Amino acid sequence: MSRSSPSGKGHSRMAEPRFNNPYFWPPPPTMPSQLDNLVLINKIKEQLMAEKIRPPHLPPTSASSQQPLLVPPAPAESSQAVMSLPKLQQVPGLHPQAVPQPDVALHARPATSTVTGLGLSTRTPSVSTSESSAGAGTGTGTSTPSTPTTTSQSRLIASSPTLISGITSPPLLDSIKTIQGHGLLGPPKSERGRKKIKAENPGGPPVLVVPYPILASGETAKEGKTYRCKVCPLTFFTKSEMQIHSKSHTEAKPHKCPHCSKSFANASYLAQHLRIHLGVKPYHCSYCDKSFRQLSHLQQHTRIHTGDRPYKCPHPGCEKAFTQLSNLQSHQRQHNKDKPYKCPNCYRAYSDSASLQIHLSAHAIKHAKAYCCSMCGRAYTSETYLMKHMSKHTVVEHLVSHHSPQRTESPGIPVRISLI
């Protein structure tokens, strides 16, 4: 550069300022391969610093991938558009941000993205987002909005991907960007909030799945609780299912008595009923010679000998007690003085006569002698009384069988008269 004479020193400075000299302001590079030596050294230093703070899950870069980064540009190309670092620092009043940056796109891409082209853009120092400059560089640049990053992250992004995109080939760039499924800055941050579960759908977009189970409305079963059928050993998880199953026992009674038309839900009830026909009384009283078919009947009879009356009247002033619960319930109805209509058979009381008449009709059916003997014609209110009566005919059965022409069935089977 030629300096002006002392006589025209002030005029030459005004005509040609020293900072407008092409020595300090080289033309910007037009191709990524024309990076100046200063930018190359700074990028290599920043990349080495990024290697020191690299996360432990990323392996160190191989020598083959670092070798192209250490190759300086050709002397012919660098002589036109390079300047050394000491000369730049000696110039007073020159700001650091005035250093021309390479025309390379600085976009934060995900780890699985691929580079489709060289997006050429200029990065401003104070703004994290970059814009494409289609007129300054080549005409192949495409504008892509970048993700806002912090100062440290933008420095790391500008250190390695920018330099690699200008020197290495696209296949090698893709392999470096996707080391172990992570980017150069490590694994991506996990999103806050509830994660949405997406089902894999290879033929179309991902299908959204609700991340919590949908419970059906209605009765739900409690944990660890089961309901057992009272007739059979089956168990159920809900009470409603057990009740539905219990109806099958009440409606269908498969155990039928061979001596009469009765049927029962289980075998134990049938065995208890067969004692009436067979006359078996396995429960004997220890105080007398009486025997009973059921244990409950023996217990009620034993209270007569012991004088035990466990069922006491709770009404104030009444000291009566009874051996059976049914007798106590009949006695308690006598204390209902607000119901003047009382039943003469069971001491029940009602507030009106219509209710009493309905109750008396039930007594008429209950005390009706529906069980009739086929040999002598006598009738009884219960089948038990009829069986006791039938035992008297066993002695002269062979004689009576020849003198009863109206008998239609065998003498051992009772006939029940249906009431209308």
UniProtKB/Swiss-Prot annotation:
The keyword Manganese does not apply. Its main location: nucleus. It holds the Pfam family zf-C2H2. InterPro entries: Znf_C2H2_sf, Znf_C2H2_type. GO terms for cellular component: nucleus. May be involved in transcriptional regulation. This is Zinc finger protein 362.
